[in-house]
Amino acid sequence: MDRIRIVGGNKLAGSIPISGAKNAALPLMIASLLTDDTLTLENVPHLADVEQLIRILGNHGVDYSVNGRREKQNEGYSRTINFSARNIVDTTAPYELVSKMRASFWVIGPLLARMGEAKVSLPGGCAIGTRPVDLFLEGLQALGADLDVDTGYVIAKTKNGRLVGNRYVFPKVSVGATHVLMMAASLAKGETVLENAACEPEIVNLAECLNAMGARISGAGTPTITIDGVESLSGARVRVIPDRIETGTYAMAVAMTGGDVVLEGARPELLQTALDVISQTGAEITQTNSGIRVKRNGAGISPVDVTTAPFPAFPTDLQAQFMGLMTMAKGKSRITETIFENRFMHVQELARLGAHITLSGQTAIVDGVAKLKGAPVMATDLRASVSLVIAGLAAEGETTVNRVYHLDRGFERLEEKLSNCGAVIERISA
């Protein structure tokens, strides 16, 4: 099993290209199931989750080509991929595929809307709390779907061959359920109004994609989304937005180690709250013609309290990284997690590097230390794993991060990007 070796203490300097957002690419890829024309997606990152979803879509009969050919492309970073779901051969998403990645459950919406039926295994992915799919199922039922859960599968069928538009109020904000219902309602009969919908930039990117395919969606990016269903959707060419989580992660790495880095292609409006918080820690963040410049000189790291919440607030997917940054702040900070109930699994691993962190319910109290010391650590999930990398970059001596397959799910060529900016970091194959 691969691991990453880091020798800390080096400032970062140079530029890092920001890849396409995984959390935007996955629903756009799934949207290809809604049409028998070709959907071309630009700026798709080369990640384990993307490759897994390609396999899942292939199981349904979706063909793909990367920049005009099927072979994987290793040069460059994000890619252009063509998806063709002209011939859906199977509406079942089996456990052995879905269990490896939670977002693959989302195929239930497009399959149900276009084919009138779907049988999808209950999902897997990062083991962060329970993350139930109740909202997905309630929403699809509101659109007229008949649902049954049997032996770990959700079996869904439409009445009279087509979903029917309706008003649905999400009991709590859910990005995944908003994605699924927006896709499903695009082919439903009549108007659907989604209230208390997620407002994340990835929702807006999906709405832009669906509208380019011929859907009639308004209000994406606000709590109320209106979808006027159409008979069919066509192909389109759409660009995946830059990854705001990757942007925030590298910005925090610079804030922690010091240095001066331009994050090429980053869009500040996608994570303004997080950038404001990073600025409060003492980093200088400015917009450039090509992205965002992050700079921190010799001044220490100031402690800042944060609470995770849905967009536009501080994102839960940056909580672990920010905790890594706060481990070396000059004073105490409080980090409160409101999205997931079990997202502090990185605390004990940061403690192995010398961090002082105590937990009180859903709040972590971080008492900053003058220095961290390298040690072997174990990644527990995607975002926790990169928080250990950030901490390792600033720690004295050598840090080894094990279970880096978590990193490969969400960060494109991370060690290469950091190494190009002066970090001493390498992947060691088992």
Swiss-Prot record:
CDD domains: UdpNAET. One of its GO terms (biological process) is cell division. InterPro entries: Enolpyruvate_Tfrase_dom (IPR001986), Enolpyruvate_Tfrase_sf (IPR036968), MurA_subfamily (IPR050068), RNA3'P_cycl/enolpyr_Trfase_a/b (IPR013792), UDP_GlcNAc_COvinyl_MurA (IPR005750). Keywords: Cell cycle, Cell division, Cell shape, Cell wall biogenesis/degradation, Cytoplasm, Peptidoglycan synthesis, Pyruvate, Transferase. Phosphoenolpyruvate binds at K22, N23. Its EC number is 2.5.1.7. GO terms for molecular function: UDP-N-acetylglucosamine 1-carboxyvinyltransferase activity. It is an enzyme of class 2 (transferase). The modification 2-(S-cysteinyl)pyruvic acid O-phosphothioketal is found at C126. Pathway: Cell wall biogenesis; peptidoglycan biosynthesis. UDP-N-acetyl-alpha-D-glucosamine binds at R102, R131, P132, V133, D134, L135, K172, V173, S174, V175, D317, I339. It is found in: Cytoplasm. GO terms for cellular component: cytoplasm. Its main location: cytoplasm. Cell wall formation. Adds enolpyruvyl to UDP-N-acetylglucosamine. This is UDP-N-acetylglucosamine 1-carboxyvinyltransferase 1. It comes from Mesorhizobium japonicum (strain LMG 29417 / CECT 9101 / MAFF 303099) (Mesorhizobium loti (strain MAFF 303099)).
